[in-house]
């Protein structure tokens, strides 16, 4: 069972990597957890960077927005810390038999605090990176390595938006296809939390239902989109 599961993970990883390695796009954003790195938005002395690339100076209004975000972020971290500590104490009492199941269930169902809203100057358009053969596009600017080349033309911006929409649809299709293949092998056990659980009867029933549904509804295949030709790589 363990060997089969490992082989399956390797196959899925290879399939996903083989399909999107040439036309990959990466989303990044503000890191509320406070872990270091150069991904997403970073502000130093009111200078805005996205994925380590300098964008511009923050305006006065954006500086006020940043100050509010910092305040909200610090409060959020404290709320998460308190919430996790509350759960830890509840589980400890339950383990010692000092707390009933209803209280423990209420703690488990209690949602964690919501993170603060990202500042308006750190949008997906600012931080999304599109990797093509030979170059990268971020914030409608073309880079070769870390060297800025030029801005996209209005027509190229439209091409990029079309590519983004098609690639998003393709990645969803690919993920759905892989999930169906996993479900056909493990049924409900494709969920990693339930993979080794004793749910044979339910898995068999689910697999049967999926097979019936698959016989009546067939999803049209989605092809990988042709990438825009913003640069030419010579091999």
Curated annotation (Swiss-Prot):
InterPro entries attached to this UniProt entry: Pepsin-I3, Pepsin-I3_sf, Protease_Inhibitor_I33
CDD domains, A to Z: API3 (cd00225)
GO molecular function: aspartic-type endopeptidase inhibitor activity
Expression across tissues: Reproductive organs and muscle.
Pfam families: Pepsin-I3
Disulfide cysteine pairs (residue numbers): 135-231
Gene Ontology cellular component annotations, sorted alphabetically: extracellular region
Keyword line: Aspartic protease inhibitor, Disulfide bond, Protease inhibitor, Secreted, Signal
Signal peptide boundaries: 1-17
Subcellular localization(s) per the UniProt record: Secreted
Family matches, as PANTHER family: PROTEIN CBG07421-RELATED (PTHR37969), PROTEIN CBG13105 (PTHR37969:SF1)
Protein's job: Aspartyl protease inhibitor.
Family per record: Belongs to the protease inhibitor I33 family.
Name by which UniProt lists this protein: Immunodominant antigen Ov33-3
């Amino acid at each position: 069972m363990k060997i089969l599961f490992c082989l399956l993970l390797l196959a899925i990883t290879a399939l996903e990597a083989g399909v999107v390695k040439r036309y990959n796009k990466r989303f990044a954003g503000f890191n509320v957890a406070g872990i270091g790195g150069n991904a997403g938005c970073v502000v130093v002395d009111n200078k805005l960077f996205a994925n380590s690339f300098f964008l511009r100076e923050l305006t006065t209004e954006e500086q006020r927005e940043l100050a509010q975000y910092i305040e909200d972020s610090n409060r959020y971290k404290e709320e998460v810390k308190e919430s996790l500590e509350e759960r830890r104490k509840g589980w400890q009492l339950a383990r010692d038999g000092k707390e009933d199941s209803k209280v423990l269930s209420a703690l488990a169902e209690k949602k964690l605090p919501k993170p603060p809203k990202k500042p308006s100057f750190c949008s997906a358009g600012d931080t999304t990176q599109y990797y093509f053969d030979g170059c990268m596009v971020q914030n409608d600017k073309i880079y070769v390595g870390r060297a800025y080349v030029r801005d996209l033309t209005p027509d190229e911006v439209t091409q990029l938006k079309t590519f983004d929409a098609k690639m998003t649809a393709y990645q969803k299709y690919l993920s759905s296809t892989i999930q169906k293949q996993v479900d056909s092998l493990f049924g409900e056990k494709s969920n990693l939390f339930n993979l080794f659980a004793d749910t044979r009867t339910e898995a068999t029933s689910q697999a049967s239902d999926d097979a019936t549904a698959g016989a009546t509804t067939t999803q049209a295949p989605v092809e990988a989109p042709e990438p825009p030709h913003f640069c030419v790589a010579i091999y």
